[in-house]
Amino acid sequence: MEFIMKTRMFEEEGWIRKKCKVCGKPFWTLDPDRETCGDPPCDEYQFIGKPGIPKKYTLDEMREKFLKFFEKHEVYPHGRVKRYPVLPRWRDDVLLVGASIMDFQPWVISGEADPPANPLVISQPSIRFTDIDNVGITGRHFTIFEMMAHHAFNYPGKPIYWIDETVELAFEFFTKELKMKPEDITFKENPWAGGGNAGPAFEVLYRGLEVATLVFMQYKKAPENAPEDQVVIIKGDRYVPMETKVVDTGYGLERLVWMSQGTPTAYDAVLGYVVEPLKRMAGVEKIDERILMENSRLAGMFDIEDMGDLKLLRKKVAEKVGISVEELEKAIRPYELIYAIADHTKALTFMLADGVIPSNVKAGYLARLLIRKSIRHLKELGLEVPLSEIVALHIKELHKTFPEFKEMEDVILEIIDLEEKKYSETLKRGSDLVRREIAKLKKKGMSEIPLEKLITFYESHGLTPELVKEIAEKEGIKVHVPDNFYSIVAKEAEKEKEEKEEEVVDFELVKDLPETRTLYYEDPFMKEFEARVLRVIGDWIVLDQTAFYPEGGGQPYDTGVLFVNGSEVKVTNVQKVGKVIVHKVENPGLFKEGMEVRGRIDWDRRIQHMRHHTGTHVLMGALVRVLGKHVWQAGSQLTTDWARLDISHYKRISDEELREIERLANRIVMEDRKVTWEWLPRTEAEQRYGFRLYQGGVVPGRVIRVVKIEDWDVQACGGTHLPSTGLVGPIKILRTERIQDGVERIIFACGEAAIKEWQKEREILKKASQVLRVPPEKLPETAERFFNEWKEARKEVEKLKKELAKLLVYELEAKVQKVKEYEFIGEIVEGSMDDLREAVERLKKPNRIVVLVSKEGYFAISVGDNVNLNANDLAKKLTSIAGGGGGGRKDVAQGRIKDVSKAKEAIESIVKLL
């Protein structure tokens, strides 16, 4: 579908719609002589060395200029909104925020939540890995950038502004605020589609650089049964109109600063505070600025992402500046590495400050990718500076604008140092792994490591393709590393697996029923209730109201009984399907629609779930205070006997930290703080409490239930809770586990369950005291004494074993047989596998074969250097007669036979071989 986007401004001010003579796309211009759209490769950069904005701006100045312009606009004042975290806790379908509109998906766009302001203006740090392999090379690509944006949400019957006003606001900002020349600005028509939405759009171009995109989101992906008269085709996909029309703009902060400074690259304009120190540290020679300028200009002229190779760019730049490709490579490579390090470490600063913990999964994997890529670049530069020192430069520069960086500085730098140490250890282990894999490939007759194997080396073992290539080429194996290797692995990491939960009851069978009244929220202490049966579906029944809690949010379902016509029927499972709660019963045949029933929940089970659920919130508050603000809940589960809480944390929790966490949690219990809950509109809850609300994960709905422990913890939570912390009872941490890289699991118990655990421990201590015949307080020193005595006894046993081995060798030396030109010892002896191994090694001589078999069936074989036989083959001969298995090297083999009665026959078969 082609949108002809004639706006009010275009008509009134004499703009001309033309078709670009290079790409054929339509664009609007004030210049009657213009023939090209202004978008590379149709036009090259015209601002490098000649800034396109009269005043030079810093990042902070340009950001404030933009925000203030829209905030104070006379006709369309916008509400200024603070940046959102780059880790989007409010949604679970993406790993990182890659655009400002993602802050408001899905809840605001769908109409389920109100925007924080309407219209609004924001400058949102955004992270994208699609161009990671081009960062540092092209002069313009970043993994992290700020998308300045103004958004308007036009709900049905509540219009704010649309295409005309958006274009006018953009033009006003560029020409009146930034003093750009109107005749050099073009608006290129280019429909946009992404994330299931689409609409007409303008790319705003100035002197060869795209400085903004204005998207008018008004379509959503069409369902299969959509009426054909409503369907539009955009970029090959089917869409239907949305109820809410959204103005989705994006202005490149870094690009506008670059435009104002006209520096050779965008990195020089916005990352100088890291670039310059790195140049000094690396002792990089000053480069002819023409090289960087031409590199940026030419990189902008073609889509390097589609080339898959840098050779063409290098060749063109070298020709332009009159040097060889080799000279260009030598001059420009250190700069490219420095630019990439500066960008990657800035992205890391935002990611770690917002709670990303490096790991091998999800956003943690992407953080680790940046860390290891940066370390590799430092190594190539010959710099031995800790990566944390470079990250510290970002914190120092940016903390005034982003004060959270200073608050998190110690944690951020410690994480970086730990990751650098881990990577060093990985590289030491990795070399052997690569060589083993190369040996396997050679056996298969392969001469090159395939891409899939390179990806596995990186994803599973942290081995960069550059390191693999270095090792492989020494072994005579080729390695081709694609220029976009890191983009490939990042893309794979960003693919979220869609896990479809199996529905217990088909939604279609209950969608016409009214929402179930939730008595467990109205009175969490309600033990019995009356209700009416609305529907029977197989083993499941639907009631008009219920006190049975359905499974959800880490809290198991309630069980209990329903009384119907004098019968008591067990309720074995409770689930929620849409807004309807369904109960699984043992005898569904007793229930009929319209019947009145009485329910009774298993109170002992419920109250223990409530203790553990409220205890989870208490413990979470203690964890954040002891370990740091980077800690986020990564999962939880409750039972009646214990609960578990998974948290993001970059190292094991120490015993000292655990004691402090447990002490703090129990202090909050003893203080008997109030626990309250209320239903709040999503946007109001977020503005009041921040995104810490989503500790337990994404909570759907326009209105969300917020559970608050007085001055301690606030979470959006659908579980049942106690009215005060005192009712939780004692909290006992049972143990911690490292369930995956970057995630710690705390298993704990509350109330009666905690008391039972203490009683168990007391019983264990009592039994240990009885066995050792000492009081409990003497157990540690007694255990230590026994352990030391055991170690001494073990040493004596080892000495005796060695003496016995010497004796065995002495006896066996007397039993040497002469078989042709060889010496042969073949005996059935007493001893363990270790004894046999030591004996054959001691008996080994250049002209001798030794075969020893124990009465348990273990065997060991040694073959001297001058013997033309293979120990591995002899092991196979032995097991071919007596069964079992074994193997080894040419000179030594071991194993175990199945039939010891055939040991003598098997040994004699080896004599015959000689």
Swiss-Prot record:
Catalytic reaction(s) noted: tRNA(Ala) + L-alanine + ATP = L-alanyl-tRNA(Ala) + AMP + diphosphate
Pfam families recorded: DHHA1 (PF02272), tRNA-synt_2c (PF01411), tRNA_SAD (PF07973)
Keyword Metal-binding: yes
Binding site for Zn(2+): H613, H617, C717, H721
CDD domains (UniProt xref): AlaRS_core
GO MF annotation list: alanine-tRNA ligase activity; aminoacyl-tRNA deacylase activity; ATP binding; tRNA binding; zinc ion binding
Disulfide bonds, paired cysteine numbers: none
Cited InterPro entries: aa-tRNA-synth_II/BPL/LPL (IPR045864), Ala-tRNA-lgiase_IIc (IPR002318), Ala-tRNA-ligase_IIc_anticod-bd (IPR018162), Ala-tRNA-synth_IIc_core (IPR018165), Ala-tRNA-synth_IIc_N (IPR018164), Ala-tRNA_lgiase_arc (IPR022429), Ala-tRNA_ligase (IPR050058), DHHA1_dom (IPR003156)
Cofactors (names): Zn(2+)
Subcellular location(s) per record: Cytoplasm
Cofactor binding summary note: Binds 1 zinc ion per subunit.
Main location: cytoplasm
Keywords attached to this entry: Aminoacyl-tRNA synthetase, ATP-binding, Cytoplasm, Ligase, Metal-binding, Nucleotide-binding, Protein biosynthesis, RNA-binding, tRNA-binding, Zinc
Domains (record comment): Consists of three domains; the N-terminal catalytic domain, the editing domain and the C-terminal C-Ala domain. The editing domain removes incorrectly charged amino acids, while the C-Ala domain, along with tRNA(Ala), serves as a bridge to cooperatively bring together the editing and aminoacylation centers thus stimulating deacylation of misacylated tRNAs.
PANTHER family according to UniProt: ALANINE--TRNA LIGASE, CYTOPLASMIC (PTHR11777:SF9), ALANYL-TRNA SYNTHETASE (PTHR11777)
Similarity annotation: Belongs to the class-II aminoacyl-tRNA synthetase family.
Protein name in UniProt: Alanine--tRNA ligase
UniProt organism field: Pyrococcus abyssi (strain GE5 / Orsay)
